[in-house]
Amino acid sequence: MRFSIFFKVVALFMITLFSFGAFAYYFVSSQISHENYQNEMRHYQFVTTINEILNNYSDYRAIEDYLYKIGFRETTIENLEKVLAKRRHQLHHRNIGYAEVFKFSDMVFILLKKDEHFVLYKDLHSVSYRNYFLAITVGLLLILFLFLFVLQSLLPLRELRSQVKPFAQGDKSVSCKSKQKDEIGDLANEFDNCILKINAMNESRVLFLRSIMHELRTPITKGKILSSMLKEELSCKRFSSIFDHLNMLIEQFARIEQLASKNYGSNKEKFLMSDLIDKIEKMLLIDEDKESPIHVSSSNYIIEADFELFSIALKNMVDNAIKYSDDKQVFLDFIGNNLVVSNKSKPLKEDFEKYLQPYFKSSNPSQAHGFGLGMYIIKNALEAMGLNLSYHYSNGRICFTIHDCVFNSFYDLEEDNEELPPPPPKI
């Protein structure tokens, strides 16, 4: 379970607040109990002293002076009559003076029997717990201030997060500039600088690619115009085919660039395998008059993918399979919903994941060649369409499997009376 940093800060604040409250309650309770015990012992000491004076000297003047010094004053409280009634009855049976201490409504009194009447003295010293509660209040305010201070310091993280998400989704107009003078502010400003640099690099890259494509298309267009003026029909067709192929390569280059920069929008559709093979043969400039090195178990299967992107991926797979096979042949078979591309060759010497890296070179001198950008393009193209690629070696063949790309077969569609999708435009 994942928790945000704000949740953790709030949870920490609540735990701190609860711990402080428990500690404050325990501390104040123990202090109050201790002070009450000390006051009780002090008052009983007063009464003991007064009773000794009465027993030995019966000097009421000295007792009054003593009570005055320790902070007791004579008082009369009418609402204490019922409380004192029982004590008066007990004190009437004593022949000599007697003093007793008691509490009433959080006030301390000393009841003194003086001859045949009673005098009530009240303790003017009041017990105050204001300092304890003041300390608790200051502690709570300090914890609250620290919590708000930390929370305010972390708020730019939420704003930075809200800016990072649109930037990751392709919005290059976000700004993360911060005036905060701490680590979070530095992080936001560095990220803002990074956005500016990335935008500048993207603009430079787009300008560079557009310039190259423009400079390449201009001579290609001129070449096509000049080739159309040739009188010999065969030469005219050959030159026209060459320029068409160059133009197609430029378009492929643009799609590959979009794919590498994660700016390509995949558009899945259904198309026949035969149409896909026709386009791949034209992309590889395979002569129609000669036997094709591409062997398909059946051309009646229907593929569900982005036609242009899938053709680029499969073209690179077929090209590598022909180039590195022992017999310069490649085989396309269908197993369930998977398309298997295989050729006769020795198994890969390195881990398959290494071949997916751009310009990978084998460490084995006997296999010093690599696949260039081919496998890298294949991997990214298939991932853009949500397809997976796997490798295995079986019966003397290297087999690459594209999973879950086969929709159905043409015959199955005819049995289900489904309408066949129109073929994609041919080049």
Swiss-Prot record:
The chain crosses the membrane at residues 3-23, 131-151. This is Sensor histidine kinase ArsS. Keywords: Kinase, Membrane, Phosphoprotein, Transferase, Transmembrane, Transmembrane helix. It comes from Helicobacter pylori (strain ATCC 700392 / 26695). Disruption phenotype: Deletion leads to a decreased urease activity to one-third of the level of the wild type. Displays also an exacerbated stress response that results in enhanced and accelerated biofilm formation. Autophosphorylated. Residues 151-203 form the HAMP domain. Member of the two-component regulatory system ArsS/ArsR that regulates genes involved in biofilm formation and acid adaptation by acting on major ammonia-producing pathways. Functions as a sensor protein kinase which is autophosphorylated at a histidine residue and transfers its phosphate group to the conserved aspartic acid residue in the regulatory domain of ArsR. In turn, ArsR binds to the upstream promoter regions of target genes including ureA, amiE and amiF to positively regulate their expression in response to acidic pH. The modification Phosphohistidine is found at H214.
